[in-house]
């Protein structure tokens, strides 16, 4: 049996010119994650990351809490969809990073404001399965994630690790879970919205079958510091 831990990256720099880097809080989350994993893991894990900066930063900071060197395998298949493209296709004003930053600064509940954009933007994306507006369609994104999962299972068969860490993003993790449970696009979007930064979703690979064991665990963040838990 192999336990697979799907990990969402730490808080990135949403609303800034370079989203794809961890915020100070995201870095603190990654270190807390590393301390949690150090106590959780029983063996030296097989490690996979997406190729995005936030994936690799999260992995590097988390693994810095360990006392042994560990190598990582990187694959673009585990990268997030282009959220900027999806959001701006729905609301063109969001192409201006300063506009988005101003909107968020004016909101007492920024996450609730983004929710009013996120769901219709994702719905629009899922209904447009041609290359007219999007470089990657919803169906292509799902197929890519399923390919990532297939290749991971092949690597597990080859290397026979007991534990695997995958550092990726909320959209990817939600598609994996939805694929295993047979969920609709709408339910997938709802899962994505609830996945916390540096949360851990656990799968079990046994007898050539993959099953969901737990979803979106981030209790260890609360144990470290009350305000470390974030979703944006």
What are these regions (language model features)?
Residues 51-52, 77, 164-171:
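Short, well-ordered beta-to-alpha junction loops that form the rim of enzyme active sites
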Residues 34-116:
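Phosphate-coordination/substrate-recognition cap region in phosphate-metabolizing enzymes
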Residues 100-140:
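Short glycine/proline- and acidic residue-enriched helix-loop micro-motifs
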Residues 3-6, 10-65, 137-145:
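Loop-to-helix element that buttresses phosphate recognition and phosphoryl-transfer chemistry
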Residues 2, 64, 68, 80-109, ...:
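Acidic, low-complexity terminal tails and accessory targeting/binding regions
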